[in-house]
Amino acid sequence: MKAAAGALGGGMPGTCAAERKAYGTPAPGRQTLALGRMASAGSDAAFLARNAAESLPAGGLAHKLEQAAQAGRPLRVKLGLDPTAPDIHLGHTVVLQKLREFQDLGHRVVLIVGDYTARVGDPSGRSDTRPVLTGEEIGANARTYEQQAFKVLDADPGRYELRFNGEWLDMRMEELFRLTRTTTVAQLLDREDFATRYAAGAPISILELLYPLMQGYDSVAVRSDVELGGTDQTFNLLLARDIQRHYGLPEQTVLTLPILPGTDGVDKMSKTRGNQIGITEAPEEMFGKTMRLPDDAMDTWFDLLALGRPPAGTAPRDAKRALARAIVTRFHDAAAAAGAQAHFDRVFVEHELPAEIDDSAIDARDGLVHLPAALASAFGVSRSEVRRLLAQGGVKLDGEPLGAGDLDLPIARVHGVVVQLGRRRFRRLQVR
């Protein structure tokens, strides 16, 4: 896909001409930062780095901002996302929100969808080799990313550019040889995850060793001034500086953000671990999953998601409800948040059924309904998940839990009955 085109320009009351030239003009009505309060590159840099884990090299961001102001151009601020799953989750929004802050100061975001690097899979933090995705899976996931990213980013074409790294990584062998000459195997094995796997005798594929070089070449291709990423990306982001230098380009500044723990409060949020909240999930799902968060992880979520903490002394349960409402409001609206809270209270506090339950048509054979097949169809899950939930007592018919042996039930016991799958999913079954 070609990059979005557009130029910054115009004026803004209360700012000098140099600031207007460097930062552009916020669209009317947007909640933009007052540039008059950000008159110096040093104060801009301090603001942007205030909740970051690291800004590397020291003083580099302020220097980049000074250079951009002198040249009368916005910074090119890069973030790469590999479409290894169809949904952007809350963990991604920590760095997306930082990108938005750069946009609000008039800079240009370059969002790179890693359709090519996703074929390899980022090995950062991995103790094994990632499974390979098909081209169809990667393409389907990639198509959802831009729309989801706009839930956080400003879609103004003057402040936003979308690129797919397949544009430049589908390179000739001669170009690949030039890229690989920029880095040594010893450098790559300095990475903690590679070093650990190498010491343990675990396999490391050549493709995985190439991944940091491919990510670094992205910075060459888009001429990035600043790159953002999680703290698990520090090695890759710094390596990109070396690669840019080898190609005769100015080295980017690196800004790393803390990693948001998942709903378990321990591990990094990811779909693989099943502890994620997707930003397109239904309000009721968002609210309910947030309420599962351990109390000791709440402050981290409030801070990293840039949500105001409740007053000191607020009871943990009330603080968590406030957190859940704020998350749903951000990605839906206040009315949806109120409805999600009412749904949660009705189902999990008052133990009543939801106000609205969708019907699902299911099939029967010889007078029996085979639950694994019927519920898989009704809820859009796998039969193995239905069997697992049956064994765990996680399937209820009209409030009565079923067991692992309840695989085939008479039509009379199922038709018109409300089935609950897990904690928050309900359907009324209608036998065809």
Which ranges hold each PLM region?
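N-terminal catalytic cores of NTP/NDP-binding nucleotidyl/phosphoryl-transfer enzymes
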Residues: L61-P123, L228-T234, A240
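Intrinsically disordered, low-complexity polyampholyte segments enriched for Lys and acidic residues
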Residues: K2, E19-K21
